[in-house]
């Protein structure tokens, strides 16, 4: 804590001198264990575990929750949108509707991890290396005497990857025809084929089909069609079902704010304390709402995989000093109907937590953002499609390890 920080806290007149002196030399000395960034996780699982003196663990609580909750929320929403696009490119276009500057910049980073190919936020490219790109604005078109002049000038200034916004006046009667004319007069003679148009209003499915027909008839089969305008996974799924002729989706406000579910409810709870003799004493939070009752104790998280398919079968929590023997048959059960059991034989098991900090020192080698994105895609692929349904997904179980029954 800086001198300025200490003086501010002193001015509140609620902290004693000893505490303020402690903050002057404060440093984190504990251990932190976490799943790799990009790992799909499920409710009631410990994404991150802090083992530290109580005051140190409490002082970092708010920032840990802020970072994990927001990034997990946006990455999850992005992943749903990318899966709905079924192989079509998805770009993050949400900066102007984000909840603050940090929400825009960090949100675009999370969207990239979730599967977006790039962002319209240049600052995210500068800070994190997420590929930035974009298209023209309606104001560009409006500043010229004619729509064609706007398109031609844009193609001359930005000949590489020129994407023309065709809905300022009339998409099919002027926008697409003027775009075709500009492409054929400016870019095609130079041998440039990397260009496109963007649809930002109207019936995107209908307009994309008509625009595609017009472009193809003009010999511009190479021209890409980008669609934007309040898109999310549900609308994109509908557009795909309607066979809309869209190559790239630019998704803004409904991604960067996770509009359909704008809160990620991660919590930070005490699970155990260590007494003077070094014994770990489990702690539990009781609630009349069963969903808010915490699983006590200092825990490890394991994931089981089917060896034949490579798909994840279930996750299991065990106490820190327990180990799951992956060489023996292992019984899992439905936690809502414990008489329903299944014995795993041809499986592998993986502990998901890795050490990030040890005795206050960073010991984890941070992968590149591209490596995190790739890891996220690989791990998401290990989940059954039924688990990833948008509506009524199949239950994926996080179980409590029972050593007596599990390895019979």
Q: Would you name each region that the model predicts?
A:
Residues 305-399:
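C-terminal terminal segments
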Residues 259-277, 373:
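C-terminal helical cap(s) of enzyme catalytic domains, especially alpha/beta-barrels
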Residues 1-14:
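Extended boundary segments
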Residues 401-407:
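Conserved small/polar residues in nucleotide/adenosyl-binding loops
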Residues 133-136, 245-251:
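Short hydrophobic/aromatic-enriched beta-strand-loop microsegments
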Residues 226-233, 252-254:
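Glycine-rich beta-to-alpha transition loops that act as phosphate-gripper elements at the mouths
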Residues 247-263:
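Glycine-rich phosphate-binding active-site loops on the catalytic face of alpha/beta enzymes
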Residues 14, 20-29, 38-220, 231-235, ...:
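Buried, small/hydrophobic-residue-enriched core segments of structured protein domains
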């Amino acid at each position: 804590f800086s001198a300025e920080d200490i003086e501010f806290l002193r001015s509140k007149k609620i902290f004693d001198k000893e505490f303020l002196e402690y903050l002057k030399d404060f440093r984190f000395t504990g251990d932190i264990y976490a799943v790799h960034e990009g790992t799909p996780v499920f409710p009631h699982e410990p994404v991150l575990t802090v083992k530290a003196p109580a005051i140190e663990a409490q002082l970092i609580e708010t920032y840990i929750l802020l970072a994990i909750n927001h990034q997990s929320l946006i990455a999850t929403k992005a992943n749903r949108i990318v899966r709905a696009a079924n192989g079509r490119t998805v770009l993050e276009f949400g900066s102007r509707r984000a909840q603050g500057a940090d929400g825009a910049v960090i949100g675009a980073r999370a969207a990239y991890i979730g599967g977006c190919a790039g962002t319209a936020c240049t600052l995210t490219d500068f800070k994190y290396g997420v590929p930035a790109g974009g298209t023209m604005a309606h104001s560009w078109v409006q500043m010229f005497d004619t729509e064609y002049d706007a398109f031609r000038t844009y193609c001359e200034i930005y000949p590489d990857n020129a994407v023309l916004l065709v809905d300022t006046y009339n998409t099919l009667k002027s926008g697409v025809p003027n775009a075709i004319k500009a492409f054929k007069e400016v870019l095609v003679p130079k041998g440039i084929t990397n260009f496109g148009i963007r649809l930002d209003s109207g019936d995107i499915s209908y307009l994309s089909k008509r625009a595609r027909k017009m472009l193809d008839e003009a010999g511009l089969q190479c021209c890409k069609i980008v669609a934007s305008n309040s898109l999310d996974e549900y609308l994109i799924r509908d557009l795909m079902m309607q066979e809309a002729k869209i190559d790239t989706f630019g998704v803004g406000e409904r991604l960067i704010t996770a509009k359909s579910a704008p809160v990620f409810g991660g919590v930070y709870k005490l699970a155990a304390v260590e007494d003077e003799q070094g014994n770990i004493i489990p702690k539990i939070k009781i609630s009349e709402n069963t969903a808010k009752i915490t699983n006590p104790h200092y825990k490890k998280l394991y994931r089981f995989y089917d060896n034949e398919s490579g798909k994840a079968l279930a996750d299991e929590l065990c106490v820190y000093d327990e180990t799951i023997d992956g060489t023996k048959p292992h019984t899992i059960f439905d936690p809502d109907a414990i008489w329903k059991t299944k014995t795993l034989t041809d499986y592998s098991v993986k502990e998901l937590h890795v050490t990030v900090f040890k005795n206050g020192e960073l010991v984890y080698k941070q992968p590149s953002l591209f490596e995190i994105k790739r890891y996220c895609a690989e791990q998401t692929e290990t989940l059954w499609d039924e688990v990833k349904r948008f509506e009524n997904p199949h239950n994926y179980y996080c179980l409590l390890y029972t050593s007596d029954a599990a390895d019979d």
